[in-house]
């Protein structure tokens, strides 16, 4: 009898695993359930900082009427914004996993949130509801472009070498993000960049984490990145509780960039921000022309940021086809577009694809199951926000550095003797980290590609959509002079 029960139990479990395997194509893509779970967790820890950082960017900046996001003029509503940030990120990331079966997580976009906070919400008479309404409009526009096939057509018109360069450039960019977040490099010196103070306790946490990450990875230990993140976090907590290091500031330059602080385990989330947006308010406060320019700038950054991240993840996971396209491209772009809309509706700024997803891919993630794991963890973070704050930048940064190396290996796919694509590829790679913008690097590469082809008398070889994309980027780069000329 007991043997029959055990056999029935094992059969049910096997059937469940088989259904899960078939749905997410886990075995087909050379992965395992364990690898997907580890990858999903690593991705979450690599980008969990957004739950803390997004509130600090959009929650501490008053709008054009002097009001803070969530109401009030003095005390930022950081807890409310953190809960909404985690909720929206969790929902759209799960959607990416289930609908598109792609190991790519989404959350409020860094850079995009700064644009919303400083370039839109801060305009005279503009409210936070107006600013979030513009984000919703941008998301709707980009969704229409996906459904009509235009966004996917632009993506497929990009030469393979430029797609490869985008992945390599993002690798350098994410390495710089990791080094900067850890304080290993700084821009505070006499040079553009210089090495940080290596004699601090937070730097010790980063270095220990980096060494451990490298050692575990070269020895092919499963869960290398996750183990290093958790180990470095424990070290940071011990140092913080014994030495009371605190957060970095002018009076405490040797502090943590995000000090681990235990304030409890659970927190009841406040979702009051959801739905606090106005679709038409900005048209009344700043006018139609300004609205169009602002939506266009948001759209371009979102449009090509996602394209670059999508390619980088696919290349690292070896999911791209011979033309450099990931599977189910349209489904990926549909979810990404809906995420932008959801970000505006949730009052947390446009949600977009996160390049930190490559950290999970580096840990073995190959399917949407990893995204589901990441999304569920974000949903848990709405209740466990105190625990999320325990992971300092210094503990998560080593994973980003290693991922940067892994993405750099793609550079062998570029023929450097073929100047038509080599020069644009170089500019794409170089300008992403140097401008601290994925979109700027892609734009420079697109424009250079058209110029080189034109100069060599090969204009007919350029796809008409590449001409259009290059022209759009010219407008993108000249938006500030255009605004100045129009007095807006």
Which sequence ranges carry the predicted segments?
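Helix-loop-helix hairpins and the membrane-proximal interhelical loops
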Residues: 2-79, 194-195, 229, 233-330, ...
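Juxtamembrane transmembrane-helix boundary signature
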Residues: 7-8, 88-110
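Helix-loop-helix junctions within the multi-pass membrane cores of secondary transporters/permeases
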Residues: 17-50, 54, 88-89, 109-118, ...
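Hydrophobic, aromatic-rich alpha-helical transmembrane segments
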Residues: 29-40, 74-82, 86, 127-131, ...
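Short helix-coil transition sites and intra-membrane helix breaks within transmembrane domains
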Residues: 45-49, 99-109, 142-145, 220-221, ...
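A generic, lipid-embedded transmembrane alpha helix
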Residues: 85-97, 114-117, 173-175
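Membrane-embedded alpha-helical modules
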Residues: 124-238, 372-488
């Amino acid at each position: 009898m007991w043997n029959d029960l055990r056999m029935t139990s094992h059969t049910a479990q096997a059937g469940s695993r088989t259904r899960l395997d078939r749905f997410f194509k886990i075995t087909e893509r050379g992965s395992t359930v364990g690898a997907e779970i580890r990858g999903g967790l690593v991705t979450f820890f690599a980008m969990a900082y957004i739950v803390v950082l997004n509130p600090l960017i959009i929650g501490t900046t008053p709008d054009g009427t002097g009001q803070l996001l969530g109401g009030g003029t003095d005390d930022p509503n950081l807890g409310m914004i953190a809960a909404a940030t985690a909720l929206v990120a969790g929902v759209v990331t799960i959607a990416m996993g289930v609908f598109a079966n792609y190991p790519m997580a989404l959350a409020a976009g860094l850079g995009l949130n700064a644009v919303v906070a400083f370039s839109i919400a801060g305009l005279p008479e503009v409210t936070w509801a107006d600013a979030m309404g513009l984000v919703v409009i941008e998301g709707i526009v980009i969704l229409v472009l996906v459904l009509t096939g235009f966004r996917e057509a632009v993506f497929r018109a990009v030469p393979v070498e430029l797609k490869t360069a985008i992945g390599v450039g993002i690798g350098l960019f994410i390495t710089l993000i990791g080094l900067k977040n850890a304080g290993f490099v700084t821009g505070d010196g006499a040079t553009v960049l210089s090495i940080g103070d290596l004699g601090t306790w937070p730097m010790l946490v980063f270095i220990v984490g980096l060494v451990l990450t490298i050692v575990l990875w070269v020895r092919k230990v499963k869960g290398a990145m996750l183990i290093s993140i958790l180990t470095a976090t424990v070290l940071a907590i011990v140092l913080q509780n014994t030495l009371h290091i605190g957060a970095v500031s002018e009076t405490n330059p040797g502090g943590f960039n995000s000090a681990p602080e235990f304030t409890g385990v659970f927190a009841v989330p406040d979702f009051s921000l959801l739905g606090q947006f106005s679709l038409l308010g900005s048209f009344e406060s700043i006018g139609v022309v300004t609205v169009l320019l602002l939506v266009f700038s948001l759209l371009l950054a979102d449009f090509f940021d996602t394209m670059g991240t999508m390619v980088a993840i696919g290349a690292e996971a070896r999911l791209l086809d011979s033309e450099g396209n990931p599977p189910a491209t349209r489904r990926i772009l549909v979810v990404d577009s809906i995420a932008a809309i959801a970000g505006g509706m949730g009052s947390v700024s446009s949600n977009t694809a996160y390049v930190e997803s490559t950290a999970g891919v580096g840990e073995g993630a190959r399917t949407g199951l990893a995204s589901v794991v990441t999304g569920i963890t974000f949903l848990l973070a709405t209740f466990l926000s105190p625990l999320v704050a325990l992971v300092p930048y210094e503990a998560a940064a080593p994973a980003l550095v290693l991922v940067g190396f892994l993405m750099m290996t793609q550079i062998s796919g570029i023929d450097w003797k073929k100047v038509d694509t080599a020069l644009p590829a170089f500019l794409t790679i170089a300008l992403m980290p140097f401008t601290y913008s994925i979109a700027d690097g892609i734009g420079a590469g697109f424009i250079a590609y058209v110029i080189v082809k034109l100069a060599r008398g090969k204009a007919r070889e350029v796809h008409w959509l590449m001409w259009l994309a290059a022209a759009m980027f010219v407008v993108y780069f000249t938006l500030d002079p255009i605004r100045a000329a129009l007095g807006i």
